[in-house]
């Protein structure tokens, strides 16, 4: 009996290690999470019942150790060196030339192993006879802190290597990090508990690893990607860096999936550019690429200089955060009258572009930052996000710094600015009397997702409003060739193109028309829901507050915005004028889609869809009765993932949300179209 129990314990450990490897390293889960949990629970129960067969490398031993009073110091047998940095193509070319000049026999085209530079915490993990024995931070490169108990809680780090005859000693070096999706979930949970949140995934990863209580670390979504081997005894390692990383992967150690061999400098630069473009879709933070000579013999020949190897370099991405000076603040007026403070900055190069303006959002943000004109500020620009001020160096504040005073009157029309209780935004009360609001409302009306009037752009609208030739959207359809041709940079041909676009735009859809009206908080999706629900403009106009709230995703606030819009005589007059100018659409027909896979489900779209646009897919889902959300959460039922899906897909996988591809989405929806 006891032998059979012992055998079952060993088999359970092997099975769980296998599935941990499949899940965490190969990203290829073989069994449902519930089945893994069942096996794990069975093993834990047996180990409690038969403590004589306890093993420190069992999958059950990742969590539960007592808190430490302090971290012990660990002396690294081989120094954990940092890398020199390159910040331009020229510096990378110089790095390659230095290598070629130093080598006795240098190949014409050197082969490099290239990988993303993860923004995490460097660690060293020692395996003795295949078992995880010690782990340490890099520290100063010579001495680090003992974080063994914490590293044992990281789910994708094996406690035992997956191989028959493991090395006597093997030191794995890598980066511990946190995915963007894991970081979001961690901060959401912290907010729900009223706790302090982390500023970014790197801080979260570093703070989690340096917890004195490993039980806290075990609750954090940490991951490891190995990038090199340190000490190795009792094993003949492969002769290239790339092959060593693939070998690590084969024995259960996770490595990055984007690693690539590149021959020659141009291919290295192509890799750098490709990864920089792919950066926003990876699902984790990186700040550059790491380029290493692939041949280990050449690495040894090149050796080290000071605290960095001669055979490797980090080619950093342009900084996403920089320091600059706030020179002034201007207050802009938006389509709905929102007053937005815009920071005028001393120009600074951030994330590949020169930034001279940044948003300050609203008055509350100005107060929160305690920012003044003349301050040295931290600017952040990431991807396509509008640059913003995220911090102030108050210790550098000059004696002549000026307090930012939020206006009480509109800077464009002089109307009173009010702030409704419960809203962060202050607004101009001038309505369409305000030229700024009029311009933005008209720009919205002609935009691609609204009336889609190609030949009428922002510059043309600004001229027409400034010359008081248009006041409402209906006035656009009353323009003639001579009026347009007399405008700057127009001419007869451009004027005729604009008139043709206006004529073509007269045939639209009810949903587009509703969206084009610019009712506050009525976006594309809500406009489509309103059109599908009421089917006619007249029915929408006459709807009560209660009837409006029966529409999908229309709550009390949005219903009130719509209701008030139709009670304003000026708005009704403009709409009637538009209809009189020939705006029309086909009758809305909503098919009975019955029960289908998407009905009453919360669905998230992510990545690039190749067979239809994102807006079209969103509309289709809503027609099928789905609620389309912009973010993944525990309440999400389904994620439709297109090409280059990023952090939303990662978060869906972490939360166990069902994911389908575009072809499956189309196949499921086709029978109901």
Curated annotation (Swiss-Prot):
<dbReference type="GO" id="GO:0003911">
    <property type="term" value="F:DNA ligase (NAD+) activity"/>
</dbReference>
<feature type="binding site">
    <location>
        <position position="138"/>
    </location>
    <ligand>
        <name>NAD(+)</name>
    </ligand>
</feature>
<keyword id="KW-0234">DNA repair</keyword>
<feature type="binding site">
    <location>
        <position position="410"/>
    </location>
    <ligand>
        <name>Zn(2+)</name>
    </ligand>
</feature>
<comment type="similarity">
    <text>Belongs to the NAD-dependent DNA ligase family. LigA subfamily.</text>
</comment>
<keyword id="KW-0227">DNA damage</keyword>
<dbReference type="InterPro" id="IPR013840">
    <property type="entry name" value="DNAligase_N"/>
</dbReference>
<keyword id="KW-0862">Zinc</keyword>
<dbReference type="InterPro" id="IPR036420">
    <property type="entry name" value="BRCT_dom_sf"/>
</dbReference>
<feature type="binding site">
    <location>
        <position position="316"/>
    </location>
    <ligand>
        <name>NAD(+)</name>
    </ligand>
</feature>
<dbReference type="InterPro" id="IPR004150">
    <property type="entry name" value="NAD_DNA_ligase_OB"/>
</dbReference>
<dbReference type="Pfam" id="PF00533">
    <property type="entry name" value="BRCT"/>
</dbReference>
<feature type="binding site">
    <location>
        <position position="434"/>
    </location>
    <ligand>
        <name>Zn(2+)</name>
    </ligand>
</feature>
<dbReference type="GO" id="GO:0006260">
    <property type="term" value="P:DNA replication"/>
</dbReference>
<keyword id="KW-0479">Metal-binding</keyword>
<feature type="binding site">
    <location>
        <position position="428"/>
    </location>
    <ligand>
        <name>Zn(2+)</name>
    </ligand>
</feature>
<dbReference type="InterPro" id="IPR018239">
    <property type="entry name" value="DNA_ligase_AS"/>
</dbReference>
<dbReference type="InterPro" id="IPR013839">
    <property type="entry name" value="DNAligase_adenylation"/>
</dbReference>
<dbReference type="Pfam" id="PF12826">
    <property type="entry name" value="HHH_2"/>
</dbReference>
<dbReference type="InterPro" id="IPR001357">
    <property type="entry name" value="BRCT_dom"/>
</dbReference>
<keyword id="KW-0436">Ligase</keyword>
<feature type="binding site">
    <location>
        <begin position="33"/>
        <end position="37"/>
    </location>
    <ligand>
        <name>NAD(+)</name>
    </ligand>
</feature>
<dbReference type="GO" id="GO:0003677">
    <property type="term" value="F:DNA binding"/>
</dbReference>
<keyword id="KW-0460">Magnesium</keyword>
<dbReference type="GO" id="GO:0005829">
    <property type="term" value="C:cytosol"/>
</dbReference>
<feature type="binding site">
    <location>
        <position position="413"/>
    </location>
    <ligand>
        <name>Zn(2+)</name>
    </ligand>
</feature>
<dbReference type="Pfam" id="PF01653">
    <property type="entry name" value="DNA_ligase_aden"/>
</dbReference>
<dbReference type="GO" id="GO:0006281">
    <property type="term" value="P:DNA repair"/>
</dbReference>
<dbReference type="Pfam" id="PF03120">
    <property type="entry name" value="DNA_ligase_OB"/>
</dbReference>
<feature type="domain" description="BRCT">
    <location>
        <begin position="593"/>
        <end position="673"/>
    </location>
</feature>
<protein>
    <recommendedName>
        <fullName>DNA ligase</fullName>
        <ecNumber>6.5.1.2</ecNumber>
    </recommendedName>
</protein>
<dbReference type="InterPro" id="IPR012340">
    <property type="entry name" value="NA-bd_OB-fold"/>
</dbReference>
<keyword id="KW-0464">Manganese</keyword>
<dbReference type="InterPro" id="IPR001679">
    <property type="entry name" value="DNA_ligase"/>
</dbReference>
<dbReference type="InterPro" id="IPR004149">
    <property type="entry name" value="Znf_DNAligase_C4"/>
</dbReference>
<keyword id="KW-0235">DNA replication</keyword>
<dbReference type="InterPro" id="IPR033136">
    <property type="entry name" value="DNA_ligase_CS"/>
</dbReference>
<feature type="binding site">
    <location>
        <position position="115"/>
    </location>
    <ligand>
        <name>NAD(+)</name>
    </ligand>
</feature>
<dbReference type="GO" id="GO:0046872">
    <property type="term" value="F:metal ion binding"/>
</dbReference>
<feature type="binding site">
    <location>
        <begin position="82"/>
        <end position="83"/>
    </location>
    <ligand>
        <name>NAD(+)</name>
    </ligand>
</feature>
<dbReference type="InterPro" id="IPR003583">
    <property type="entry name" value="Hlx-hairpin-Hlx_DNA-bd_motif"/>
</dbReference>
<dbReference type="Pfam" id="PF03119">
    <property type="entry name" value="DNA_ligase_ZBD"/>
</dbReference>
